[in-house]
């Protein structure tokens, strides 16, 4: 099955920004993470109070979903880019959070929604009222150009004309062909970098500059814009970085890296990893890894993930009829032993499921901390229902269970933090393993690891070539064969050459 032996080196000979290669990040939806004042809504102080938990988990960075003023619960329609949503606290609360994170060795990344504003933003209200400079901040047309947006028409009626809003009418697109808009957003980035932000996750990164003919994603001008914005933030703070929401194919993602983007979310790898675990077959994951090996440039940093605020949680997607901890652990094991910079989504380390409905809110339900009232999230009425009433899923319960999903994540993150080969090493896909097993080598500065991941029932793997190695998850010596349980993994440290 395995014909290719390829090497993947993520960074060689190129000066890249912090954080350290392979650091594990953790995505937080403030509204759902920790409530400090009992109003049922998570906030910055509540999240600051939980930083010790994240430090114990082993993460090195925190990504905060939008924290600015916004009329929506999710915050992706901003009304003031230089503010903190009052639901979440004050600017002083944010600065205290950033200091506390940095004291624990964690980077702080915030969402930067550059593509569009809220229709309630003062800029847009002034534009609709006829203010010429503000009207030039957006794209207006006397007639409807007839473009298709993301889920509906891209142009929306306004007075005697139309304005562009790719996502929907209440998210009008900014016009970056106007230099004043670019200067404004550069100043916003400068504002947050001065307040302790280390990097920005750029939302809707593919859609910032459309073509005049109606191409709404990944135009050459758009890709160049992203590279220029990366260079701008580095001119302000040399170790700052962008993480692009590159929800597209591998060939297109590579174009962003060649333009200068530091980090890209690897959506094809996400789809292949979760799909292969669902299918109990490593074939598609292996195919995508081979593609990545062939296409990514050496300066590319891939943000890898199995979950985020837009996706069905693995606690649901990997166990539609019942909780399937074996699948959850295999997906986590792959994420944390493959190359890249893993981004976890809050509650993923517990295997939390989606809520019962189809709304996006069901992917963003409150965190379950302990068995007390409202699972320790709030002393008030939670802003949204919990995704489960099972107290065994909480942090407190899983911390006491050595075989829990939480402790599996902690084990793998600790292993990743201890072994540079897992964070920085190249990737070599191994031939000759059973069809249900994906094998790969990670190597860095003489440290050599072999990872064997089994996607189906119990199987024996020929490990004669690695006899005398140590299996790091159990501490046992490796003999002529290694038995992998159903959905099981082995991480072998080879003796120094």
Spans of features found by a protein language model:
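C-terminal beta-strand-rich structural cap/linker in extracellular carbohydrate-active enzymes
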Residues: 480-497
């Amino acid at each position: 099955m395995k014909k290719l032996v390829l090497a993947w080196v993520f960074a060689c000979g190129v000066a890249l920004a912090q954080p350290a290669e392979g650091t594990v990040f953790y995505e937080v939806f403030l509204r759902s993470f920790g409530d400090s004042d009992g109003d049922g809504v998570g906030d910055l102080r509540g999240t600051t109070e939980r930083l010790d938990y994240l430090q114990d988990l082993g993460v090195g960075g925190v990504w905060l979903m939008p924290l600015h003023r916004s009329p929506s619960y999710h915050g992706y329609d901003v009304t003031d880019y230089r503010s903190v949503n009052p639901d979440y606290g004050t600017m002083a609360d944010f600065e205290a959070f950033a200091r506390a994170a940095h004291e624990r060795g964690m980077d702080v990344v915030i969402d930067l929604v550059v593509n569009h504003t809220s229709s309630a933003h003062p800029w847009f209200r002034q534009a609709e009222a006829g203010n010429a400079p503000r009207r030039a901040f957006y794209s207006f047309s006397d007639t409807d150009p007839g473009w298709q947006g993301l889920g509906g028409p891209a142009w929306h009626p306004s007075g005697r004309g139309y304005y562009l809003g790719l996502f929907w009418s209440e998210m009008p697109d900014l016009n970056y062909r106007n230099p004043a808009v670019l200067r404004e957003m550069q100043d916003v980035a400068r504002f947050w970098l001065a307040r302790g932000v280390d990097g920005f996750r750029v939302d809707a990164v593919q859609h910032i500059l459309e073509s005049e003919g109606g191409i709404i994603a990944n135009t050459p001008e758009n890709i160049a814009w992203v590279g220029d914005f990366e260079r701008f933030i580095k001119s302000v703070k040399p170790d700052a970085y962008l993480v692009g929401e590159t929800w597209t194919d591998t060939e297109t993602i590579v174009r962003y890296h060649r333009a200068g983007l530091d980090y890209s979310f690897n959506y094809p790898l996400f789809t292949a990893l979760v799909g292969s675990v669902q299918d109990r077959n490593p074939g598609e994951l292996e195919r995508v890894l081979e593609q990545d090996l062939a296409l990514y440039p050496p300066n590319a940093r891939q943000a890898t993930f199995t979950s985020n605020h837009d996706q069905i949680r693995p606690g649901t997607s990997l166990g539609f009829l019942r909780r399937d901890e074996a699948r959850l652990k295999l997906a986590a094991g792959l994420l944390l032993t493959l190359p890249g910079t893993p981004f976890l989504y809050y509650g993923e380390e517990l295997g939390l499921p989606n809520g019962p409905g189809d709304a996006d809110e069901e992917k963003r339900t409150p965190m379950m901390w302990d068995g007390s009232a409202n699972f320790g999230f709030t002393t008030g009425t939670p802003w949204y229902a919990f995704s489960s009433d099972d107290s065994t899923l909480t942090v407190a319960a899983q911390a006491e269970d050595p075989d829990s999903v939480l402790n599996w994540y902690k084990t793998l993150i600790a292993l990743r933090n201890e072994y540079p080969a897992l964070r920085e090493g190249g990737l070599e896909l191994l031939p000759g393993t059973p069809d249900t097993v994906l094998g790969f080598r990670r190597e860095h500065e003489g440290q050599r690891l072999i990872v064997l991941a089994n996607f189906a029932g119990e199987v024996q793997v020929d490990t004669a070539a690695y006899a005398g190695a140590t299996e790091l998850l159990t501490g046992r010596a490796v003999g002529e064969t290694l038995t992998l349980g159903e959905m099981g993994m082995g991480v072998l440290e080879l003796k120094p050459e």
